[in-house]
């Protein structure tokens, strides 16, 4: 091997030993006739000293520049008193260089590797092979590897089998658009890249592989945001003969062990909260419990007021009027309130009413708000008591359809919590359970809240009689307001699966066309089964403190689903298109 040690492995225990390093020149300094090279590899940095007594190596060190690839032979020694660098893992020692071999030269990089804050993301992605040399980026990928190793070890130890499922499969309605791959051998037909291994892992349960896992690549052709990529990685898990409590316990233990091994963090038992409670208290099915702010329903106090903005939703069975108290924020400027009003409009809110509590003892005169005059004093006091308002607080109100109020005030809760730095802890894991089976659309039709293979907590007859109120056997793990993983007990009886399909408007012939293989499998002794899938990219993003999953993926796509480094997607030549029996209606425009 060309090296004996990684740079980041050097420490005082190696003092006096001769070692060989290979890496990149991170920095070169010439101090009074002595040349210092900071050599960098994936594990860290080491300082190598060259003095004029060794003419050949000194001359070589004098010629090297940043990002040259070098091989260094030298002896580890303690740094002189006063020269210890506490910012480096190997800062107590240095290497006295005996030999220096330049393995390759480098042009000046397109951006400095130690000062990247002013470099645009597109430039960083265009030169990703340079960007990944930065210690911050290398550390994220090292931690990602440790995370997957820990997860694999836990699942292996608990009897799970790592089984690969197909990448080329058929399109199924799973919510997002599929990436389609034309078939050369079947003209006019297309494969689809999997949005998840969902159906294949269920078929593995039917086949008797009762504990399955896979670190799976998944693909979704959807609009991107900070936590989305067109291709992403999933920790996919499925089991037979376990109920939801068993699966929750098994995977929660996995995550607790993971955080202990990788970050040395101890988590207690994760609290459980129903979907209904999460929406009412936090306006979200993935609440961030680090934030102490909560939504409080106040519609019962506003049904009789003349202010239609409140009384309308208060008397609407599908409406909601809720309050959000922000302690100590009564001094908030009007311009800030206007900014928050504009913010909630993104979620469909038509306005943002508020009450500033200056002196409650003075009654309505001690309150500052344009809406106080519309609310009887007794009702006003009940509302302020219910939300726990005291002098110095501000209370915001939302009034509209339940979904709009919940989403708008829920998002405002998160924004204010971040703006005012209200978080009470660093980590807040939890489970959300008892999700509705379906979401009702404006036209009265239904959409599966999770996916159409989730089992309900009722019989097929009860489900078809009351689909709008049916609950599912689904569960989501949430960490700091981010959904880490979602899962459910699956439907394992054909009659139930067909009932769900019917409620989703999938006709029998379409059921056979798209899911015939699954319905066939359910006829042949499918066991009770369920599972869960974690988003690996999101998990690594949270554990590294990254702002985007693009920071924890080696070669991510941009917000427009493009790879600026390889220039993908690209134009395909006419011959390849003919072989695929494809003709373009419009020629692609040159960029």
Curated annotation (Swiss-Prot):
Offer an example of a GO molecular function term for this protein. Answer: aspartate-tRNA(Asn) ligase activity
One Gene Ontology cellular component: cytoplasm
Which residue ranges run through the membrane? none
Keywords for this entry? Answer: Aminoacyl-tRNA synthetase, ATP-binding, Cytoplasm, Ligase, Nucleotide-binding, Protein biosynthesis
The residues that hold ATP are 220-222, 229, 483, 535-538
Matching Pfam families, A to Z?
GAD, tRNA-synt_2, tRNA_anti-codon
Positions of the site: Important for tRNA non-discrimination? 31, 82
* EC number(s) on file: 6.1.1.23
Q: Name one GO biological process term.
A: aspartyl-tRNA aminoacylation
Q: Where is this region: Aspartate?
A: 198-201
Positions that bind L-aspartate: 174, 220, 450, 490
The keyword Kinase appears for this protein: no
Give the reaction(s) catalysed: tRNA(Asx) + L-aspartate + ATP = L-aspartyl-tRNA(Asx) + AMP + diphosphate
Q: Where in the cell is it found?
A: Cytoplasm
Note the superkingdom of the native organism.
Bacteria
Q: NCBIfam families under this entry?
A: aspS_bact (TIGR00459), PRK00476.1 (NF001750)
Protein family (similarity comment): Belongs to the class-II aminoacyl-tRNA synthetase family. Type 1 subfamily.
Protein task: Aspartyl-tRNA synthetase with relaxed tRNA specificity since it is able to aspartylate not only its cognate tRNA(Asp) but also tRNA(Asn). Reaction proceeds in two steps: L-aspartate is first activated by ATP to form Asp-AMP and then transferred to the acceptor end of tRNA(Asp/Asn).
Partners and quaternary state?
A: Homodimer.
User: What protein name applies here?
Assistant: Aspartate--tRNA(Asp/Asn) ligase
**Gene that encodes the chain:** aspS
């Amino acid at each position: 091997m060309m090296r004996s040690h990684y740079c980041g492995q050097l420490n005082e225990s190696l003092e006096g030993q001769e070692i060989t390093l290979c890496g990149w020149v991170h920095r070169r300094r010439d101090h009074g006739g002595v040349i210092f090279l900071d050599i960098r590899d994936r594990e860290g940095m080491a300082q190598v000293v060259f003095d004029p007594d060794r003419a050949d190596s000194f001359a070589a060190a004098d010629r090297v520049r940043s990002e040259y690839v070098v091989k260094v032979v030298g002896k580890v020694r303690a740094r002189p008193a006063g020269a210890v660098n506490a910012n480096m893992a190997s800062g107590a020692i240095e290497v006295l260089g005996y030999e220096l071999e330049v393995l390759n030269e480098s042009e000046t990089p397109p951006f400095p590797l130690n000062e990247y804050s002013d470099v645009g993301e597109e430039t960083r992605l265009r030169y990703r092979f340079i960007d990944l040399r930065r210690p911050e980026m290398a550390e994220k990928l090292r931690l990602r590897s440790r995370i997957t190793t820990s997860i694999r070890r836990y699942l292996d130890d608990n009897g799970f089998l790592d089984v690969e499922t197909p990448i080329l499969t058929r399109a199924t309605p799973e919510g997002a658009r599929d990436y389609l791959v034309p078939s050369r051998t079947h003209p006019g037909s297309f494969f689809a890249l999997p949005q998840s291994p969902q159906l294949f892992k269920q078929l593995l349960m039917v086949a008797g592989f009762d504990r399955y896992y896979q670190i799976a690549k998944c693909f979704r052709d959807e609009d991107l945001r900070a936590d989305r990529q067109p291709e992403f990685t999933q920790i996919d898990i499925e089991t037979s003969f376990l109920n939801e409590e068993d699966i929750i316990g098994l995977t929660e233990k996995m995550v607790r062990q993971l955080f202990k091994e990788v970050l040395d963090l101890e988590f207690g038992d994760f609290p459980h909260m129903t979907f209904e409670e999460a929406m009412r208290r936090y306006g979200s099915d993935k609440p961030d419990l680090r934030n102490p702010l909560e939504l409080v329903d106040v519609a019962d106090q506003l049904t009789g007021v003349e202010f239609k903005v409140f009384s309308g939703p208060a008397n609407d069975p599908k409406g909601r009027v809720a309050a959000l108290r922000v302690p100590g924020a009564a001094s908030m400027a009007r311009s800030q309130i206007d900014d928050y009003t504009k913010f909630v409009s993104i979620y469909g809110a038509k306005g943002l009413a508020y009450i500033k509590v200056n002196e409650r003892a003075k009654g309505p005169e001690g309150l500052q708000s344009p809406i106080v005059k519309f609310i009887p004093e007794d009702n006003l006091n009940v509302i302020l008591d219910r939300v726990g308002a005291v002098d110095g607080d501000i209370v915001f109100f939302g009034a509209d359809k339940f979904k709009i109020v919940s989403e708008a005030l829920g998002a405002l809760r998160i924004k204010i919590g971040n703006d005012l730095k209200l978080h009470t802890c660093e980590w807040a894991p939890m489970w959300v359970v008892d999700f509705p089976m379906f979401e009702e659309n404006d036209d009265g039709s239904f959409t599966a809240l999770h996916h159409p293979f989730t089992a309900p907590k009722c019989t097929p007859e009860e489900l078809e009689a009351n689909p709008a109120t049916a609950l599912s056997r689904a569960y989501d793990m949430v960490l700091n307001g981010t959904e880490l993983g979602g899962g459910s007990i699956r439907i394992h009886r054909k009659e139930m699966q067909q009932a769900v399909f019917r409620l989703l408007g999938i006709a029998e012939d379409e059921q056979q066309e798209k899911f015939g293989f699954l319905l066939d499998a359910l006829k042949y002794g499918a066991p009770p089964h369920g599972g869960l899938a974690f988003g690996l990219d999101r998990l690594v993003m949270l554990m590294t403190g990254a702002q985007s999953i693009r920071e924890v993926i080696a070669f991510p796509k941009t917000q427009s689903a493009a790879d600026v480094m390889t220039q993908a997607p690209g134009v395909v030549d006419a011959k390849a298109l003919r072989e695929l029996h494809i003709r373009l209606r419009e020629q692609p425009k040159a960029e």
